C-alpha cells in the first residue's frame, strides 16, 4: 500500500512541475508550486524523514509563499490565464507531460536505472552511522553529515535562493 502512495505522490509531483513550467498565470503558477512542495514533503515523510519533511514544509512553503504572494499581488490580471484558456499553454503542458513520459520509459526500459543512480561514493557517510546505540537520532546525524560533508551543497543552496529572490524582484519591478 505504501508503494502505491509514494507512486501516486511521485506522479502528482512530476505533473505539478510540468504544470508550472508550462507558464500559466502567476496565480496558478504559485498554487502549483505550493502543491508540489506539499507533495514533495509528503514523499520525504513517507520515507521516514519527519524532521526533514517538516523543515522543507516550513522553509519552502513559508518563505516562498510570501514571495509568490507579493508577485501575484503585483501581477494581478482581470482574466488570469489557465492551462486550457490558451492553446499554446495547453500544448506546452501536454508536450511537457509527453516528454516526461518518454524520459521515464527510456530510463526504465531494460533496467537501466544504474546509469542514473550510482552509490559509489557512500563510504564517507558511514562515519555517521548511529548503530543500535539509541542515543542519537538518525535525522540529527544526517544534519551533521550535511553540514560537514555537504558544505558545498549548503553554500550552493543558499546562493541559488539568493539569486532566485533577486530574479523575482527584478521581474516584478516592472518598467
Curated annotation (Swiss-Prot):
It catalyses: a ubiquinone + NADH + 5 H(+)(in) = a ubiquinol + NAD(+) + 4 H(+)(out). It is an enzyme of class 7 (translocase). Its EC number is 7.1.1.2. The chain crosses the membrane at residues 1-21, 25-45, 47-67, 88-108, 149-169. It comes from the Eukaryota. GO terms for cellular component: mitochondrial inner membrane. Core subunit of the mitochondrial membrane respiratory chain NADH dehydrogenase (Complex I) which catalyzes electron transfer from NADH through the respiratory chain, using ubiquinone as an electron acceptor. Essential for the catalytic activity and assembly of complex I. Belongs to the complex I subunit 6 family. Core subunit of respiratory chain NADH dehydrogenase (Complex I) which is composed of 45 different subunits. This is NADH-ubiquinone oxidoreductase chain 6. It comes from Halichoerus grypus.
